[in-house]
Amino acid sequence: MNVAIVKYNAGNIYSVIHALKRLGITPTLTDDAELLAKADKVLFPGQGEASTAMAYLRQHDLDRVIPELRQPVLGICIGQQLMCRHSQEGDTDCLGIFPLDVKRFQPQQHTDKVPQMGWNSIHDLKSPLFKGIGDGEFIYNVHSFYVPHHEDYTIATCDYILPYSAALNRDNFFATQFHPEKSGGVGEKILRNFLEL
């Protein structure tokens, strides 16, 4: 299987590469449009700042290439946020794959910490991406921004300060706010499910 990872100026790419290697897949890290289009599956992971990431994507024409991909695509963390329409982070226009806006967590009480860092549970699982995953399983998060729940696109929810979209799906595009590559056996199962789509 030919698996590509979108290369751009975002951290945490190599933990995804290592997670895929544990599943027997050696992915290609690339920002080449032709290689991305030819891949069987594409992953779009990363951690970083939205406006900086979008500037790189535009500079390399990836803002056009990614939304036109026809194979299964999985965005992870900032990858999910960049697949949305707009992010409050840097007042950034994003790829628009999901017609949703990314918002910053607003602490409601003094015990609320931003960013969310650590383990939390996912619920309301509605996709083959979560085949064999039980409601309430724990996944690993590091993020200050979130996508609100949307009836048409949310395929998993999480609750931190408020309920939000832990995962999204539209056609061939999937995305998780959490890090499957850092979520132990549950995350490995989610990645395997994606590869089997």
What are these regions (language model features)?
Residues M1-A4:
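Extreme N-terminal starter segment of soluble prokaryotic enzymes
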Residues A39:
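An anion/phosphate-binding loop that grips the pyrophosphate of nucleotide cofactors and donors
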Residues L43-P45:
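Structural motif
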Residues G48-Q116:
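Cysteine-nucleophile active-site neighborhood
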Residues R85-L162:
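Pocket-forming structural segment of enzyme catalytic cores
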Residues G136, N169-F174:
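Beta-strand-turn-beta hairpins that frame and shape the catalytic cleft
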Residues L162-N169:
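Short, surface-exposed beta-strand/loop micro-motifs that present aromatic residues
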Residues T176-L197:
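Acyltransferase
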